[in-house]
């Protein structure tokens, strides 16, 4: 019998609405939206503390580390400053992601192989204090293997490219995802997925081999503008079986 896929709700774009006026408004209240997400069925909350602070702020990490009732997953760049924050606020998970200041959103996966020497001690330091580590990567066998060698607990596959493609190219990208998931599972890594997922693509991602977790944000926040955060998350929770 297939296990239920864990739903992580990314609330970055709740913070985007708050910050759009330069952070001068206290609404929408991030913790309130987190509580509504949990009530709707979120089993994890994900935030990306970017170096440019375009949405999530350090204060948000501080508040959620104290008051989030489900596991907290912190997405962050591999920098010494971010490692310091992670050590201080102790999220349940840290997901290492790439960052470019000019990008509108994360554009692709992390090159773990290229950054291995820099990230290895970071992974070690965080795991030593009980934080689990995932690597946000493209569905590449090489990147899966590098993630295994660096000691990660999980890989999160970047699904954005697959979401955007059509026809034969979409089918080819799906095969890449499936092959990478099989290899990750064989190596003992947990299999996660995220980026660009909406209700329709979440019906399909259910079929990814060995999938244990998805992290979804933008589409849920958009749907919530009409139907509320709790209902938005509840609808997604029903899809992920």
From Swiss-Prot:
It catalyses: 3-amino-2-oxopropyl phosphate + 1-deoxy-D-xylulose 5-phosphate = pyridoxine 5'-phosphate + phosphate + 2 H2O + H(+). One of its GO terms (biological process) is pyridoxine biosynthetic process. The active site is at residues 48, 75, 195. It is found in: Cytoplasm. GO terms for molecular function: pyridoxine 5'-phosphate synthase activity. GO terms for cellular component: cytosol. 3-amino-2-oxopropyl phosphate binds at residues 10, 21, 196, 217-218. 1-deoxy-D-xylulose 5-phosphate binds at residues 12-13, 50, 55, 105. Its EC number is 2.6.99.2. Pathway: Cofactor biosynthesis; pyridoxine 5'-phosphate biosynthesis; pyridoxine 5'-phosphate from D-erythrose 4-phosphate: step 5/5. Keywords: Cytoplasm, Pyridoxine biosynthesis, Transferase. The record marks 156 as: Transition state stabilizer. Catalyzes the complicated ring closure reaction between the two acyclic compounds 1-deoxy-D-xylulose-5-phosphate (DXP) and 3-amino-2-oxopropyl phosphate (1-amino-acetone-3-phosphate or AAP) to form pyridoxine 5'-phosphate (PNP) and inorganic phosphate. Homooctamer; tetramer of dimers. Belongs to the PNP synthase family. This is Pyridoxine 5'-phosphate synthase. The lineage of its organism: Bacteria, Pseudomonadati, Bdellovibrionota, Bdellovibrionia, Bdellovibrionales.
């Amino acid at each position: 019998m297939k296990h239920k896929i864990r739903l992580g709700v990314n609330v970055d774009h709740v913070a985007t609405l708050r910050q759009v006026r330069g952070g001068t408004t206290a609404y929408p209240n991030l913790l309130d939206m987190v509580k509504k997400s949990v009530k709707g069925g979120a089993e994890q909350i994900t935030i990306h503390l970017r170096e440019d602070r375009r949405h999530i702020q350090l204060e948000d990490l501080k508040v959620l580390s104290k008051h989030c009732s489900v596991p907290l997953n912190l997405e962050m760049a591999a920098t010494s400053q971010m490692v310091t924050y992670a050590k201080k606020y102790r999220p349940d998970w840290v997901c290492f992601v790439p960052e470019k200041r000019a990008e509108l959103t994360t554009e692709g996966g992390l090159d773990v192989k290229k950054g291995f020497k820099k990230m290895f001690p970071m992974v070690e330091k965080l795991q030593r204090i009980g934080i689990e580590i995932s690597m946000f990567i493209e569905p590449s066998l090489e990147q899966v293997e590098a993630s295994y060698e660096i000691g990660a607990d999980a890989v999160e596959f970047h699904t954005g490219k697959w979401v955007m493609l059509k026809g034969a190219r979409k089918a080819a990208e799906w095969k890449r995802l499936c092959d990478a998931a099989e290899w990750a599972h064989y190596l003992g890594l947990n299999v996660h997925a995220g980026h660009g997922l909406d209700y329709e693509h979440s019906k399909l991602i259910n079929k990814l081999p060995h999938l244990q977790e998805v992290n979804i944000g933008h589409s849920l926040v958009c749907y919530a503008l009409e139907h509320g955060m709790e209902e938005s998350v509840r609808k997604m929770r029903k899809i992920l079986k």
